[in-house]
């Protein structure tokens, strides 16, 4: 308990938060039981820290080998979790694996026996096939945003990774949607479901609570001009524009660029270095507009 308290104090300090929220506290408490966990929570609720604290509390310096595996649906989420881990888990060897990243660099890092691996299903499965990732010592498995992993078509890769894992002691599955049934390969043991979808206290808020939603109907041929008028009239700060196709992202960006508006494109057809460069510009406010596909 003393080690867990120290972990919590360090996490709060390094992440600049005063204390854990209700969901994070309940996750820590529930994780002490032998049951697997299904965590249902909305975006922006502190879910990442909620599952990372129990994961880190189970890692032992006496064990050589991979003790925890976190599977996520996207490169950006893998990098986001890796960034949090770097702040709260100093001294623990961590490797982040995802498509578009150098396989050679990942292979070198994996050869030094990491305790924790974060990655996307396709890249993790590939490393396992090639013998670069061995999960004989795995204690904890996290399936983060599991619903999105399935929606993106990763069921085969996830089954390939998870089905052979018979000795995992703790599985944590997170999702933004509630489902009565799960694929058999998840093989959860007497799972406890923690449902935080729409159950926040009156004084608890998330980033989405600060958003206002408006709808503007426009003929397809006038959409770009309507968007341009909105940007000129509203003069917004940081702005995310979502499109449903990569080609649409590129078309909208070119339209705005031709009219003197700086904007970054962000989609799965771009090289990883270009994606990271676009995000960096958006984060440091050198570009105030980012145009993205909803699954990028």
Regions found by a protein language model. Give the residues of each.
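Conserved pre-motif I regulatory segment
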Residues: 1-40
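Conserved interdomain hinge at the start of the Helicase C-terminal
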Residues: 209-258
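Conserved nucleic-acid-binding Ia/Ib motif block in the N-terminal RecA-like helicase ATPase lobe
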Residues: 5-10, 64-129, 137-140, 251-266, ...
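Post-DEXD/H (motif II) to motif III coupling segment of the RecA-like Helicase ATP-binding lobe
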Residues: 134-204
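P-loop (Walker A) phosphate-binding loop of NTP-binding proteins
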Residues: 40-43, 73, 244
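Walker A/P-loop NTP-binding motif
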Residues: 25-37, 48-63, 79, 84-88
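Pre-Walker A (Motif I) flank of P-loop NTPase domains
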Residues: 33-39, 64-68, 114-115, 169-170, ...
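Walker B catalytic acidic pair
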Residues: 121, 137, 145-146, 245, ...
């Amino acid at each position: 308990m003393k080690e867990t308290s120290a972990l919590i104090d360090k996490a709060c300090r390094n992440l600049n938060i005063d204390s854990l929220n209700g969901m994070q506290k309940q996750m820590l408490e529930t994780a002490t039981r032998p049951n697997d966990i299904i965590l249902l929570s909305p975006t922006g609720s502190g879910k990442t820290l909620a599952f990372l604290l129990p994961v880190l509390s189970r890692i032992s310096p006496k064990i050589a080998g991979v003790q925890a595996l976190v599977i996520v649906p996207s490169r950006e989420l893998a990098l986001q979790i890796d960034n949090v881990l770097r702040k709260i888990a100093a001294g623990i060897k961590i490797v982040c694996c995802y498509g578009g990243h150098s396989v050679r660099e990942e292979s070198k890092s994996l050869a030094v026996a990491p305790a924790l691996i974060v990655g996307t299903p396709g890249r993790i499965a590939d490393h396992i096939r090639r013998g670069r990732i061995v999960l004989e010592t795995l204690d904890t498995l996290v399936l983060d945003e599991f619903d999105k992993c399935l929606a993106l078509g990763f069921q085969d890769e996830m089954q390939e990774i998870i089905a052979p894992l018979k000795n995992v002691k703790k599985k944590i599955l997170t999702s933004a949607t509630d489902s009565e049934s799960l694929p058999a390969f998840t093989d959860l043991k007497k799972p406890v479901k923690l449902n935080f979808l729409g159950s926040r206290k009156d004084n608890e808020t998330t980033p989405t609570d600060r958003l206002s939603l408006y709808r503007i109907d426009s003929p397809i041929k006038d959409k770009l001009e309507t968007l341009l008028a909105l940007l000129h009239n509203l003069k917004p700060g940081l702005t995310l524009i979502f499109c449903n196709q990569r080609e649409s992202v590129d078309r909208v960006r070119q339209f705005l660029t031709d009219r003197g508006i700086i904007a970054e494109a962000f989609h799965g057809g771009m090289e990883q270095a270009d994606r990271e460069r676009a995000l960096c510009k958006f984060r440091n406010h050198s570009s105030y507009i980012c145009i993205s596909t909803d699954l990028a």
